[in-house]
From Swiss-Prot:
Pathway the protein contributes to: Amino-acid degradation; L-histidine degradation into L-glutamate; N-formimidoyl-L-glutamate from L-histidine: step 1/3
UniProt-annotated location(s): Cytoplasm
Gene this protein is translated from: hutH
Family matches, as SUPFAM superfamilies: L-aspartase-like
Listed EC numbers: 4.3.1.3
One Pfam family linked to the record: Lyase_aromatic
Protein name: Histidine ammonia-lyase
Record GO terms (molecular function): histidine ammonia-lyase activity
Enzyme class of the recorded protein, top EC level: lyase
Catalytic activity: L-histidine = trans-urocanate + NH4(+)
Cellular component per GO, a single term: cytoplasm
């Protein structure tokens, strides 16, 4: 069901809503503040003004930041302090985030502020949402965050357009934020006390990466099952290892789910061996798909749990607690520390890398006639020597799998002290998220290469089976989808365009969707 409206209250934002806003057109769905959120925001903003009137010393409101935490700011400079944090912290480098990630960042940050513990004014949160709904997207360099105190540098870039600084992308054009505001008839905001800090201090960037990449990993997980089954059919393997009774004796729920998925995909196939005494079991890369892919599903489920919580967390510092009588307490803490997210991102990265490792080994088996016991010709070509066939397809997969082994090294164990050793342990959560994004990109390509080779192998097997050839209930539609765009490769030709096509089918979720239509019951 299409999501047409997202109401932010700081407590109920879902992963599906974030994805709808991230990938939707500006204003579809429209994002608004809930009435309760408006009340909370206004109450906390008034509490900040009360603190100033009483001369209370509070971090980031009447003091400097980081190592300057004990430098008290004069009352007539507190607003300048908030301007200064944006311009001094907007020092990110590297390519800018894509628009879906940028939109997710803006939405998540607004939801955090909507909880009413950060002290920003209502007009500030609403301006951020106005930008989101109008499709005014800040240009946010992707590198520069340590993941504590939150994502300072990228969030400073996100906030710059609120005050008429920085660059935005709007209606397909990159332009100064001031120009975009002028065209809309909007005045730049003058930040009040606490607002610059509240906009920049939090985990919205690593959380946005986590939400988007978790969703991509879910699609890849389903695609990996499909690729594995198509390879098993091409290799004349046996589905005996997917028997429900076997998996019930090792009751990891997602291993059991994966095995059931494989059975549904292969239901009705004549390409597999059943009760063949000459071939009682396959190599690990086929036989152990449920154990490996199931473990990856566990990592994905854990990541989804983490990011579902973080979407509705308040990750600012300090936080304001206002009671029913209007009394306020300011508490300095560490909710900005991204360790829970960084560990989840690292965990998901190494898990998804395993999908690529096992897929590359299946691809090797498809191309090596010795490994596949001559079920398929060497490198999937009849005229080997004159033709190289799929030889270098496997090389590319091997290169990508090897790159992922480097990328899978965890970022979260590699803290580095900053701010004169005041901020002496950091999470490196955005680094973990960017690595995860690269791993997922690579695995998407590896699975495309496996599907390309498996479809080629199926055609060789089809020649052998003749009129008896029938693919599984789930694998058959996927094979047909591939063959709509990519032919059987009878002799050497330029393969790259075909790889690009299948890669797009994988990335767009069309491979998973083709099988899912036929995945409505257990086998």
């Amino acid at each position: 069901m299409q999501i047409r409206e997202v109401i932010l209250d700081g407590e109920s934002l879902t992963i599906e809503q974030v994805l709808a806003v991230a990938y939707g057109q500006p204003g579809t769905p429209v994002v608004r503040l809930a009435p309760i959120a408006r009340q909370r925001v206004e109450r906390a903003a008034q509490a900040v003004q009360d603190l100033l009137a009483r001369g209370v010393v509070a971090y980031g409101i009447t003091t400097g930041f980081g190592a300057f935490k004990d430098r008290v700011i004069a009352p007539d400079q507190v607003e300048r302090l908030q301007y200064n944090i944006l311009v001094s912290h907007a020092v990110g480098v590297g390519p800018v985030f894509d628009i879906p990630t940028t939109r997710a960042i803006m939405l998540i940050r607004a939801n955090t502020l909507a909880r009413g513990h950060s002290g920003v004014r209502l007009q500030t949160v609403e301006r951020l949402l106005d930008m989101l709904n109008q499709g005014i997207h800040p240009r946010i360099p992707c590198k520069g965050s340590l993941g504590a105190s939150g994502d300072l540098a990228p969030l400073a870039h996100m906030a710059l357009p609120l005050i008429g600084l920085g660059e935005v992308e709007w209606q397909g054009e990159v332009l100064p934020a001031a120009t975009a505001l002028e065209r809309l008839g909007w005045q730049p905001l003058h930040l009040a006390a606490k607002e610059g800090l509240a906009l920049t201090n939090g985990t919205a960037v690593m959380c946005a990466l986590g939400v988007i990449e978790t969703a991509r990993a879910e699609t890849l997980s389903a695609t990996a099952d499909i690729a594995g089954c198509l390879s098993l059919e091409a290799l004349y393997g046996t589905p005996a290892a997917f028997d429900a009774r076997l998996h019930a004796l090792r009751p990891f729920p997602r291993q059991i789910e994966c095995a059931a998925h494989l059975r549904r995909l292969l239901a009705g196939s004549t390409f597999v061996r059943n009760n063949d005494p000459r071939h009682v079991q396959d190599a690990y890369t086929l036989r152990c798909i449920p154990q490996v892919h199931g473990a990856v599903r566990d990592a994905i489920a854990y990541a989804r749990w983490v990011f579902a919580i973080e979407l509705n967390a308040v990750t600012d510092n300090p936080l304001l607690f206002v009671d029913d009588d209007g009394n306020v307490e300011v508490i300095s803490g560490g909710n900005f520390h991204g360790e829970p997210l960084a560990i989840a991102l690292d965990y998901l990265g190494l898990a998804v890398a395993e999908l690529g490792n096992i897929a590359e080994r299946r691809l090797m088996r498809l191309t090596d006639e010795a490994s596949n016991t001559h079920v398929l010709p060497a490198f999937l070509t009849r005229a080997g020597g004159l033709n190289s066939g799929f030889m270098i397809v496997q090389y590319t997969a091997a290169a990508l799998a090897t790159e992922n082994k480097v990328l899978a090294h965890p970022a979260s164990v590699d803290s580095i002290p900053t701010s004169a050793n005041v901020e002496d342990h950091v999470s490196m959560g955005v680094t973990a998220g960017l690595k995860l994004r690269s791993i997922i990109d690579n695995v998407s390509q590896i699975l495309a290469l496996e599907l390309f080779a498996a479809a080629q192998g199926i055609d060789f097997r089809r020649q052998e089976l003749g009129s008896q050839a029938r693919l599984g209930r789930g694998t058959g539609p996927v094979y047909e989808l591939i063959r709509q765009y990519v032919p059987f490769i009878a002799e050497d030709t330029l393969l790259h365009p075909y790889i690009t096509i299948i890669s797009e089918l994988v990335a767009q979720g069309k491979i998973a969707a083709a099988a899912a239509v036929h995945d409505d019951a257990d086998a």
